[in-house]
Amino acid sequence: MAVSARDYWDLTKPKVVALIVFTALVGMFLAIPDMPTWLQVRTGALGFLGIWLAASAAAAINQLLDAKIDAQMARTSWRPLVVGKVRPWQVLVFAGALIVISMTILVVWVNVITAVLTFASLIGYAVIYTVYLKRATSQNIVIGGLAGATPPMLGWAAVTGLPTSADWINASLLVLIIFIWTPPHFWALAIFRRADYAKAAIPMLPVTHGVPHTRKQILVYTVLLAIVTLAPVAVGMSGVFYLGGAIVLNAVFLWYAWRMLNPPDELFSMKMFGYSIVYLMALFAFLMVDHLLLPWVR
């Protein structure tokens, strides 16, 4: 049976990658204080493409290495490799091609630092997290979350090359936001899917430490997140428009986290999971709008 374009598309986890590259795009915008030059626009577009291809490759490798686990979990049992729509060698060739194209674009037309950071993130997620951390510790998503948190820095690097300590610090603050956001986001899903993780012998926190403990950890990280998201304002990266949006978004997220301690039903964790995605997209949208469209409110 021939492999369809949709099968290859599904290997890239397009919804997940869309959120990843959106945060990279915001990083690009925030890195440029004024109107971008034509060179910055061209470099940014090529950087966006390279980061997107690398993230897609990482997703495909993750599915290749996690095929046996995916087959045991209802959430992932439909994936192309699991149901036999594609073969392992086809996934490997596809991912390899994406990596080669991505690295070529980044090295030749963007800059070496972006290529190095992007490749390191790819290895961090597709290999270190998938092969080792995911199966080794209940803190898998905390430690491994760093690889998934780097896209804003990758975007920042693409248009600037990170020439100053201020660039590194500001880009790192955006990384920190996603890093702290990842545990409550993923643990909300893990609570609902804990039986699947237990069946697949994946030591997610709800499996190893129980649901009540996980709910408390979600609240702790959500409080930390509310604090960390104030950092862009504290360093002068963002202004009152972003601050207002962040306050509202954090208030709702904190309500979800507090309500998770005594949820009304089993589905509530999935409602929080869904909101966490909206939260991150909206937060970074506020960062971008504040930076580009509303300088007069600063």
Curated annotation (Swiss-Prot):
Pathway: Porphyrin-containing compound metabolism; heme O biosynthesis; heme O from protoheme: step 1/1. It is an enzyme of class 2 (transferase). The chain crosses the membrane at residues 16-36, 45-65, 93-113, 114-134, 141-161, 172-192, 223-243, 244-264, 277-297. Signal peptide: none annotated. CDD domains: PT_UbiA_Cox10. InterPro entries: Protohaem_IX_farnesylTrfase, UbiA_prenyltransferase, UbiA_prenylTrfase_CS, UbiA_sf. Keywords: Cell inner membrane, Cell membrane, Heme biosynthesis, Membrane, Transferase, Transmembrane, Transmembrane helix. Its EC number is 2.5.1.141. Coiled coil: none annotated. It is a multi-pass membrane protein. GO terms for biological process: heme O biosynthetic process. One of its GO terms (cellular component) is plasma membrane. It is found in: Cell inner membrane. Pfam families: UbiA. GO terms for molecular function: protoheme IX farnesyltransferase activity. It catalyses: heme b + (2E,6E)-farnesyl diphosphate + H2O = Fe(II)-heme o + diphosphate. It comes from the Bacteria. Converts heme B (protoheme IX) to heme O by substitution of the vinyl group on carbon 2 of heme B porphyrin ring with a hydroxyethyl farnesyl side group. Belongs to the UbiA prenyltransferase family. Protoheme IX farnesyltransferase subfamily. Carbon 2 of the heme B porphyrin ring is defined according to the Fischer nomenclature. PANTHER family: 4-HYDROXYBENZOATE SOLANESYLTRANSFERASE, PROTOHEME IX FARNESYLTRANSFERASE, MITOCHONDRIAL. This is Protoheme IX farnesyltransferase. It comes from Xanthomonas euvesicatoria pv. vesicatoria (strain 85-10). The lineage of its organism: Bacteria, Pseudomonadati, Pseudomonadota, Gammaproteobacteria, Lysobacterales. The gene is cyoE.
